[in-house]
A protein has these predicted regions:
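Conserved C-terminal "switch" segment of AAA+ ATPases
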Residues: 46, 50, 63-64, 200, ...
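Conserved alpha-helical scaffold flanking the Walker A/P-loop in AAA+ ATPase domains
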Residues: 73-76, 129-149
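C-terminal engagement/docking regions of AAA+ P-loop ATPases
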Residues: 25-32, 38-43, 280-395
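Walker A/P-loop
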Residues: 78-115
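Walker B catalytic acidic pair
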Residues: 88, 151-152, 163
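AAA+/P-loop NTPase substrate/partner-engagement loops
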Residues: 104-132
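Pre-Walker A (pre-P-loop) alpha-helix and adjacent loop at the N terminus of AAA/AAA+ ATPase modules
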Residues: 48-84, 89
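Canonical AAA+ ATPase core
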Residues: 130-135, 152, 156-160, 168-258, ...
Length: 395
């Protein structure tokens, strides 16, 4: 198969090795050989994983009309073991989507409504004196659940937001000198309203960087709003549980073992480097737009999210289009734009879309026999990945 090009070498084994290669193996994905598979003891096949994931997404879409991209990206974030920030105006089903996901995935769920008078002990827990025992007991907070909905997180003061950092980054909380680990699986899904400015505390860069994905949730389209009205005029549908926490952990392990070819890894690095030194990639005009580029967490996040998306689509290897599909959601919230860019109403999403458009993706290098085989068996893939006349560009 032509796309087996992205399944041959060991994952991120060395960028120099990938650059020296000039041909593609003629082995096809359908020949039954495990080329470059990360985990030979996977608990289920890719087809079975894709079927379960599809059923889970289908159950959520029984409740959520439209918003297909948000639903898919929520699944990607959970499978990538990441935290997710949903941004949208009130009433676009952010909270309902998270609650439905928790039901479908079978995990415990807690919703924390962030307010200006919230204190850290309200969310992580505190010591409580027991008169009968004459000792202090630890009362854990609501964040010790599989899925935590931090509703309107930007309404909480800085000390509460900072209390979330250890939990999100280390997946543990320290109370009175004791460390309490978060359960498995564990994801914080936060929401915020982009239009409100009174009584809000904007998330600092350090906390935004902890979120794997930031998903913009738009208004539903006209036909979708009509369907919402139709469904809610009768008994609202309820999602059914499809997975268990143990199954979610197994799927997360499968996602982390999805194969990443060296050429795709090199492409990820180039995308991130382009946000730090845009002039080196033919985008000198962005030098006055970007104040601070993406951190190395963006590099790791792109690979993790692309792996999860590949698993959602039933593949055990990552394509460049997987990276492109998650680039805006992974990278945009990590950029710090200049004051000039903000004054000109330039958004971080626009900048990332420009970077993705300007940085060329890797393409397989075929000889004539391989080209004819691919043209016969995978004509659609040829349309996306035309054979280049020169080897992939070096860093």
């Amino acid at each position: 198969m032509a796309l087996s090009r992205y399944r041959e070498c060991g994952p991120v084994a060395g960028l120099a090795q990938a650059r020296q290669e000039t041909s593609v193996s003629t082995q096809h994905y359908s020949d039954g050989q495990d080329i470059g598979k990360g985990n030979q003891d996977a608990p289920m096949s890719n087809d079975e994983a894709a079927r379960l994931i599809g059923q889970a997404i289908g159950q959520v879409q029984r409740v959520i009309v439209g918003q297909e991209r948000m639903v898919e990206q929520l699944m990607v974030g959970v499978l990538a073991k990441g935290h997710i920030l949903l941004e949208g105006v009130p009433g676009v089903a952010k909270t309902l989507a998270v609650r439905s996901f928790a039901t479908v995935l079978g995990g415990s769920f807690a919703r924390v409504q962030f307010t200006p008078d919230l204190v850290p002990s309200d969310i992580v827990g505190t010591r409580i004196y027991s008169a009968s025992k004459e000792t202090f007991d630890i009362e854990l907070g609501p964040v010790f659940m599989n899925f935590v909905l931090a509703d309107e997180i930007n309404r909480a003061p800085a000390k509460v937001q900072s209390a979330m950092l250890e939990l999100m980054a280390e997946r543990q909380v320290s109370i009175a000198g004791q460390t309490f680990p978060a359960p498995h699986p564990f994801s914080v899904i936060a929401t915020q309203n982009p239009v409100e400015s009174e009584g809000v505390y904007p998330l600092p860069e350090a906390q935004r960087d902890r979120f794997l994905l930031k998903i913009d949730v738009p208004y539903p389209r006209g036909n979708e709003e009509f369907e919402i009205l139709r469904r809610m005029s009768v008994k609202a549908p309820q999602p059914q549980q499809v997975l268990t926490p143990e199954a979610v952990v197994a799927l997360q392990d499968m996602a982390s073992d999805v194969f990443v070819h060296n050429l795709v890894a090199e492409y990820v690095v180039r995308l991130v480097l382009a946000t730090r030194n845009p002039g080196d990639f033919g985008m000198s005009d962005l030098a006055n737009v970007i104040q601070i580029g993406c951190s190395p967490r963006a590099t790791l996040g792109l690979v993790a999210a692309a792996r999860a998306l590949a698993l959602v689509h039933g593949r055990d290897y990552v394509l460049p289009t997987d990276v492109q599909a998650v680039a805006v959601d992974v990278m945009a919230h990590r950029l710090v734009l200049s004051f000039d860019a903000i004054a000109d109403n330039v958004s971080a999403s626009d900048v990332i879309e420009r970077v993705v458009a300007m940085v060329p993706p890797p393409t397989p290098v075929w000889n004539e026999e391989q080209r004819q085989t691919a043209q016969h068996n995978y004509p659609n893939d040829l349309g996306q990945y035309p054979a280049p006349t020169t080897p992939p560009a070096q860093l």
